[in-house]
Amino acid sequence: HSEGTFSNDYSKYQEERMAQDFVQWLMNSXXXXXXXXHADGTYTSNVSTYLQDQAAKDFVSWLKSGRA
């Protein structure tokens, strides 16, 4: 019935939001600890940021797929 559909949609929204918050928290905590200084540090940092962003997107997609 309609109440169940709303509850299910809301639960999915909450799960997605929690996953996004978790990934954001991971990215924020990892960013503070990744301060390595070397000649190609900027390039390495940009690649690391890209890979972290991609991993976060993949993780959220995996959570949304319901295979957890």
UniProtKB/Swiss-Prot annotation:
SMART domains: GLUCA. The keyword Secreted applies. Keywords: Hormone, Secreted. PROSITE patterns: GLUCAGON. Pfam families: Hormone_2 (PF00123). It is found in: Secreted. Its main location: secreted. InterPro entries: Glucagon, Glucagon_GIP_secretin_VIP. Induction: Produced in the A cells of the islets of Langerhans in response to a drop in blood sugar concentration. Belongs to the glucagon family. Promotes hydrolysis of glycogen and lipids, and raises the blood sugar level. X's in the sequence were included by homology with American goosefish sequences. Gln-14 is a unique substitution from leucine in other known glucagon sequences and glucagon-like peptides. This is Glucagon-1. It comes from Oncorhynchus kisutch (Coho salmon).
